[in-house]
């Protein structure tokens, strides 16, 4: 017994030493490096903002000659969200659903003003509701945008500076979609219908009609752009940054800092989704699932530092007097498990549930969560839910535990006979081992159990 206790305390001491060594030699240097990197990035950001405060806004031009238009640099002045929205109120379409409030900027048809009605900044219900998206000329600009890349033959196609016209609807709700339109000088008409459900999924359907005399080819693009990193403290136990499920590359999770060194460019793919995720919220885009596209996670340091997840699809051709239709999805909201699971099923979005970081043991953590969530919804109390989950898990493992306890009882019952064998064979370890194994066999005891 004393020997067993000594081994037990040695094991505890070694475990503590391993944890302390890991903290001292691995975590502390890593935390210090992160602190220095954040401090350097902050100084660089302050320097860049000081240099560009008098510069005009850039990156607002339309897409031309096959290039993806720039995401926009810093604005001449930094406004609050309310100031920016008020400045462009005449060219905005209001969004009002049970879960969302905000507006769409007709310039670029950009979704850059979005708040979550049912979530607050603190547990105090009187605190401000969460702001997810903000215009580019605010301190923490964050938005999504869909556009096109054309050529000289297509003329000017929708891009960041395109001024769309509201052709039907006056407010975007979960029951009333809106339609925007734009016609260029080559006779190509773009009609964009935007709808949203009662939670967080936007459906953007573009109809492109060619009334010209020659076929035209153009590529659609989509992007999620974010100015500066979120100010919330990062956590090592979950991923915050770029995320996507892209073709054969599968689930891709890239930290913001990683793209500051080199952009992440997965292989050309068909199907999937991409965007950015925070601890509780996310913004992702789901391109048309039947057309190949090139995806990219990148960082731009010109002007205000910004991060961008974007894709550009292979070109499609619209014949004269013909039209085509493209449908994109945009998720922008809270990472609610039932909602995300429903979207994965109803929209056939591959592995969309991985938008939530379930950790390495996804096959264990998600079922455990669903079980606990079921009990919470039934009883309305997390303490009771945890207790019920513990009982269920214990019940599932009861047969295994029962065998273990039975084996331990048998081993205890055999202890006197074991002592007799030790006294009989003394230092003859080989004979003692053979006699012990024979005893286990006769008594039908499995010591491993």
Task: Describe the role of every protein-language-model region.
Residues 24, 43, 188, 321, ...:
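Membrane-interface amphipathic helices and adjacent TM-edge segments
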Residues 1-395:
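Membrane-protein biogenesis/insertion across secretory and organellar systems
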